[in-house]
Amino acid sequence: MAIVSSITNHSSLPNDKGEERLVGPSLLKEELKLSQQDSLRPKSFDDFVGQSELKKVLEISVKASLKRGEALDHLMLYGPPGLGKTTMALVIAEELGVKARVTSAPALERPRDIVGLLINIQPRELIFVDEIHRLNRISQELLYPAMEDRRLDLTVGKGTSSRMRSIEIPPFTLVGATTKPAALSSPMRDRFGITQRLDFYNYLDLENIIKRSAKLINLVISEEASQQLAKRCRGTPRIANRLIRRVRDYAEVYSHSKKIDVEVVNDALDLHRVDQRGLDATDRSYIGLLVNQYQGGPVGLETLAAGLGEDSTTLETVVEPYLMQIGFLHRTSRGRVVTPAAKKHYLLTSPNNIDK
């Protein structure tokens, strides 16, 4: 399977010091340099760990389309970042035996970008559009007839002399990935024949991902070490693979070994200030402010943002979701409130009750 990529715009959200978060779900700058042929990516449904229900649905659809000799129905994959939407799209292309054209919505701002993508498409090829919810209205409307009727409707000329020209295109599969499916227009959503959600991974699946990745980069990791890593990666494979690379770096420099035990994992991640629940310094500062200055809340978002020197949108979309996921934070009509579990964890992991 060939992969053609035109992704030019991904962003990871840094903290207020301009540093990228090791446990953030978005791609880091170093990861942007990795191609879609990253050695840790699964190449088949069998290699893809987790998401068992999703895999079953897609395996059936892929096998049925191959049996009929037809293009797979258009597919929308949605869910939090870092769970494998891009990887799943590439696996599908591999299973179909077709080329994958990989792009993102910011690279498709102008009509000619859409036309350029579709005009040379080959029968049954797969187009993957990341962040598809960011497509503007004109780009979405250009895709409507392409997805439904396999044609491009182009306006030729200007003013009174303008006319509509339709160009037929071969059957193809559009795979759209999004963290915000509701941000897509209703007509756009309706044109996807298959819509599937990716969920956060359980500890067992994450352990298996970590073991698989360790083997691929020639590491020997103990059972206890893989369990410890799984607890710290926030249910997200992207973070799991990122952490195992950092642990590898630490082991090679300090242990001069490719054997990873639980002590190496703890030492490496303590150095990066990632605790046993996957919280980093930003998370602990957030909880610490609530616990130490506001007795656990409730506190308004803007007040917290001012106290931390962070943007309120960053807190709401990057910091808070994981804290809510693990039961450390409640959003109420009166403001943010930390739970007893959050207070207990904070007091245990911050000796002076303040994360400096």
From Swiss-Prot:
It is found in: Cytoplasm. Mg(2+) binds at T86. Disulfide bonds: none annotated. Keywords: ATP-binding, Cytoplasm, DNA damage, DNA recombination, DNA repair, DNA-binding, Hydrolase, Nucleotide-binding. Residues 1-20 are annotated as: Disordered. Gene3D superfamilies: 1.10.8.60, P-loop containing nucleotide triphosphate hydrolases, Winged helix-like DNA-binding domain superfamily/Winged helix DNA-binding domain. ATP binds at L40, R41, G82, K85, T86, T87, R191, Y201, R238. It catalyses: ATP + H2O = ADP + phosphate + H(+). DNA binds at R331, R336. Residues 1-14 have a biased composition (Polar residues). GO terms for molecular function: ATP binding; ATP hydrolysis activity; four-way junction DNA binding; four-way junction helicase activity. One of its GO terms (cellular component) is Holliday junction resolvase complex. Residues 13-201 are annotated as: Large ATPase domain (RuvB-L). Homohexamer. Forms an RuvA(8)-RuvB(12)-Holliday junction (HJ) complex. HJ DNA is sandwiched between 2 RuvA tetramers; dsDNA enters through RuvA and exits via RuvB. An RuvB hexamer assembles on each DNA strand where it exits the tetramer. Each RuvB hexamer is contacted by two RuvA subunits (via domain III) on 2 adjacent RuvB subunits; this complex drives branch migration. In the full resolvosome a probable DNA-RuvA(4)-RuvB(12)-RuvC(2) complex forms which resolves the HJ. PANTHER family: HOLLIDAY JUNCTION BRANCH MIGRATION COMPLEX SUBUNIT RUVB, PTHR42848. Belongs to the RuvB family. This is Holliday junction branch migration complex subunit RuvB. It comes from Prochlorococcus marinus (strain NATL2A). The lineage of its organism: Bacteria, Bacillati, Cyanobacteriota, Cyanophyceae, Synechococcales.
